[in-house]
A protein has these predicted regions:
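C-terminal structural segments of small proteins and small subunits
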Residues: 74-100
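Alpha-helix C-capping/helix-to-loop hinge sites
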Residues: 26-33, 50, 82-85
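Short runs of predominantly hydrophobic/aromatic residues within well-ordered alpha helices
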Residues: 40-43, 75
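Mid-chain, well-packed structural core segment of small domains
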Residues: 51-79
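Residues at alpha-helix boundaries and short interhelical turns
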Residues: 13, 34, 51-55, 69, ...
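Acidic, glycine/proline-rich low-complexity segments that act as flexible tails and inter-domain linkers
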Residues: 1-41, 66-67, 93-103
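Contiguous, well-ordered alpha-helical segments that form the cores/surfaces of helical PPI scaffolds
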Residues: 42-51, 81
Length: 103
């Protein structure tokens, strides 16, 4: 997340703590419910974040994917695979959002 997104997330978490705890627990539960490994789960969520044009979501899942062992090549390829699905302009925006984090 960018600094602004991180501040916003923390503000929402402070204001709506019970709801955010439930959302975080749901995320953990669904990740633990099947055979998809952490790195692949983050790459899937990275693609989904880009599909809904969520810059903050892309930033977050780039960080999480890196923490789970993804390479920068895997990050970029995950988005490039979406070119025929969500379009070239969206993928180019996503690549710039990955670049924000890798700088």
């Amino acid at each position: 997340m960018t600094e602004i997104t991180q501040k916003h997330y923390l503000n929402i978490k402070e204001r709506f703590g019970e709801v955010m705890t439930a959302v975080e627990n749901l995320g953990k539960t669904v990740k633990d419910a099947g055979p998809v490994k952490a790195k692949e789960a983050e790459l899937i969520q990275l693609g989904a974040a880009l599909a809904i044009r969520s810059e903050g979501g892309v930033h977050s899942h780039v960080r999480r994917a890196l923490d789970a062992g993804a390479t920068k090549e895997e990050l970029y390829h995950t988005l490039i695979l979406l070119t025929s699905t969500i379009g070239f302009p969206a993928v180019m925006a996503g690549i710039s959002w990955i670049d924000d984090i890798l700088k």
